[in-house]
Each structure stands twice: as structure tokens, then as C-alpha cells.
Amino acid sequence: MKRKDFLSTLLPLGAVLAASASTKNVVIESSKIPPYLKKGDTIGISSPAGYITLQEIEPAILKLKEWGFNIKIGTTIGKRDFTFGGTDAERLADFQQMLDDEKVSCILCARGGYGFIRIIDSLNFKKFTKKPKWIIGFSDITVLHSHLNANFGIASIHSKMCNSFPDDWAKADDVQKESIESIKKCLVGEKMKYTITPNAKNKTGIAYGELVGGNLKTIESLSGSKSDIDTTGKILFVEDTGEYLYSLDRMFWNLKRSGKLNKLSALLIGGFKIKKDDVGEEFGKSIEEIVLEKVAAYNYPVCFDFAVGHQKNNFALKCGVQHKLSVHLNECMLIEVK
């Protein structure tokens, strides 16, 4: 996983965002859902992983204010300790303050990179669990999504971060704008619906379950730790960037061997920016072949080319929230059901 949030479209994803229709006669249990935001609420911006400057997050600040939210800038913005947004102690203190501040209704991570795993075990979630708030991010922030789900059953939002907001909104691609706008839709409580162009390699079917997942390499790195997620009965989504095909094959084998694939409700495969094989060391399998080999014995639906990852079409997903996935030959759809 690279530190940079790549903005190039990696796979032909063709996702469309809209408010979903209600789904009836579905008995489900949900994670704890933080309160949705309203105009005038405060969003705190912190950088618990890689470093970023105030100038780099200004486009995000402008858009969030345009949506009607107030902004609190964390002390890590503008700080740098090598690749990190400040020392471990500084990043820990900033994020802890955001967690505990009752005036902050939501925490938006400024960027990913690497570093959350260095502070996750030192964070105190006591106040947060009593009064949860939405936490937003992806890539390295998968550490937090997984930790919240595994330990507290609290929902969070997997989406673009501050470093992905376009400098000039008027010149941004429509899909980039839609991806950013999906964050607002999640925050204000819209039920999300995504329609995905089918991939011929998909495994068809209909599934219900809690949505969990994130960056594949990060998920793999959490195996056996207190942040490791239980995927039983859940819809798992994964994405990654900057990896060789053989490395991805190893990661998916690890998921299979550790029991994360055998009891899924469904599997979503997002964008994968793949390193070119070294000459003479070609792996010989596509990402679809790698995945299908590992899930051949299972009957749940598998959807490729989902609009999540290090790319322009990286739509906001509510982790820990119940969804319905329908994978058909002519259409694939993910709908939030509660």
C-alpha cells in the first residue's frame, strides 16, 4: 500500500450513486450507528498517519463549509516527523482530543499513508463508545475501521479523505465529484445505493450482511491482533494499490487460511492498482483468477470492479451497517438496508 492517494481510475467501474429504496421483510442486527450530522455541526480534521499541510486540505475545508459544517483543525495538520503527521505522541494526543471533544460530531482523517497502527492501542475509547461519532477515512485508516468493528461494534465511513478533494471543483471529473458528494450523503443519513456495471467473472447471487473491509494489505496485517475483524456472515470489501500480483495472491491465500473467506455472506472486489511483473517473473493470473481460485468452494456472490479504492471513483461506504448485495448478469447493486 502506497502513501499517496492515487487519483487515476484503475479499473472500469461505472458506479452510480443514488438514495436507495427501502428493503422489506429483512430481519437484521446492526452495529451502533453514530448520530447523523446536521448543518452547524463540527467536523474535526486530524492526520493520525501521514503528514499533510494546511494548504493541501484547504479544498476539503471549503467544501465542508459549503455543506454547512463547521471545521476544527487538528494540531497534526502541518506537523511532520519524517513520513508521519507528527510524532506518535503528537498524533495520539490530537486524535484522542478529537475523540473526547463533545463539540466535534465527526472526525475526518486528512490522509492515509502509514502510522495508525502505531497509536491504535494507546487510544482511549471510553468517552467515544458512550457518545460515538462518525470517523471517516480509508487506506491506512482501515486499522481504525477494523478496530471499531471488532471491539465496539460502532459504524464508521470508508471514503476519500482531505487529500482527495479537487483543487478546482469546476474542473473535476463528474465521478470524482460524485465520490466526494457521497461523503455528505452518508453523513446526513441518506440510505446509500450503488449500481455497478457487471463483470463477466462475477459470481451471481443475493446476500445480506454487515459491510466490513478496506485495504487488503492492512486487513492482512491485523490478523491475530485485537483489531482483527470477524467476517462471519458479513459482506467483505477489499482494495489495494501498488502491489504485485503474486503479493495479492499471497494475501488472498492468507485470508482463506485464516478463515476470513469461508463464512462470508458476499465478497466485493474494489480497485487494484497492480505493479507490473518483473520481466521473467510473470505471475500469470489476473486479479479475478486469483480471487476466484480462493472462493471456488463457496456459494456466496462475488462482485468485481466495485467503486472503492485508490482511485477517482472511491465512493463512501458505511462500515458496520447492514446492506443487501444483488449480483446479476445484467446488473449489480449494493443497497443499505438499515
Regions found by a protein language model. Name each.
Residues 3-25:
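N-terminal export signals
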Residues 20-52:
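C-terminal segment of N-terminal export signals and the immediately downstream linker at the start
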Residues 125-147, 155-161:
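Short, acidic/small-residue loops that bind anionic groups at enzyme active sites
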Residues 157-217:
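Conserved anion/nucleotide-ligand pocket segment
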Residues 253-338:
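C-terminal active-site/capping subdomain that shapes the small-molecule cofactor and substrate pocket
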